[in-house]
Design a protein with these regions (language model features):
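Serine-esterase "nucleophile elbow" of acetyl-processing enzymes
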Residues: 1-57, 61, 69-73
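Conserved catalytic-core segments centered on acid/base and nucleophilic motifs
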Residues: 23-24, 138, 245
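Alpha-helical cap/lid subdomain in secreted, periplasmic
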Residues: 74-231
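Histidine-centered active-site loop/cap adjacent to the catalytic His
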Residues: 232-262
């Protein structure tokens, strides 16, 4: 399905090169790519959507300078949607520490010693460096018709994570580096991971406002009564959403295109 590749062949454009909407960014963009690959979607997507992603899906998500230069080449006159990171809370706070921590304002079930409350401002300061590259990327897309930043899906509940984390190399490697088995580590609570995700969404929205771009959040319909990602949208791994979630995003992008068309 790839039509164009970057100079090294590492990155590719999937879909029509003349598509009005260009989706790019990190690993959560894969759900849109998977959705646009469905036969029923290929026949019915209007306006057309193209996704710039890895040529080899198993080699990991995009992110280097060549990738963003390729996006710039493709962006002229397009509505560019950047799926920015979205896994910082999973990568940094999947496991509890000793002593246990929480965020101020988060309700935690406590057994024994109370967790140490961390101010929200401190968490925001911790995450901010993961957004700084946007200050370099956004100005290079000056020829785009519009730019929108989109965050990743809300977290999955503990019940799902416990079933699949034993097979996820990123997290088993963390455990190995600590000299323990991943099954011995305590996963942070749903309420804490959800609030960490909320901080990320707030930060991305703030950067969008500062950089003069649009912001598109997770569709509310994708979340359960507790705010977590609904089970019908789970990919098999710990952190990502599936093509059904991608279909929801495609619909949001169609609405977005109508709002920002020039």
């Amino acid at each position: 399905m790839a039509k164009l590749e970057s100079k090294s062949g590492k990155w590719a454009l999937y879909g029509d090169v003349n598509a009005q909407i260009l989706v790019c960014g990190h690993s959560h963009a894969a759900s849109i790519l998977e959705a646009t690959s469905l036969p029923e979607m290929q026949a019915g997507i209007e306006p057309k959507i193209a996704v710039c992603y890895s040529t080899d899906w198993s080699a990991g998500p995009p992110g280097d300078k060549e990738y963003w230069d390729f996006v710039v080449e493709l962006s002229r006159g397009k509505h560019v949607v950047i799926i920015w990171n979205g896994n910082q809370h999973n990568a940094n706070f999947m496991f509890q520490t000793e002593p246990k921590f929480t965020m101020l304002g988060v309700t935690e079930k406590s057994y024994g010693r109370e967790p140490v409350p961390i101010p929200r401002a401190m968490i925001k300061d911790f995450f901010k460096p993961t957004f700084e590259e946007l200050k370099e990327i956004i100005p290079t897309l000056a020829n785009a018709a519009s730019i929108t930043l989109m965050n990743g899906p809300s977290p999955k509940p503990l019940s799902h994570i416990q079933n699949c984390i034993l097979q996820e190399r990123y997290f088993t490697d963390i455990a190995k580096s600590l000299g323990v088995d991943v099954s011995d580590l305590v996963i942070t609570s749903d309420s804490l991971r959800l609030e960490l995700w909320n901080v990320l969404a707030e930060l991305l929205n703030n950067y969008a406002n500062t950089l003069g771009t649009g912001f598109l959040s997770t569709p509310e319909i994708s979340r359960d009564a507790f705010g977590m990602l609904s089970s019908e949208y789970w990919a098999p791994d710990v952190t990502h959403a599936n093509s059904k979630y991608g279909v929801l995003l495609v619909e949001e992008l169609r609405k977005l295109s109508g709002k920002v068309s020039t």
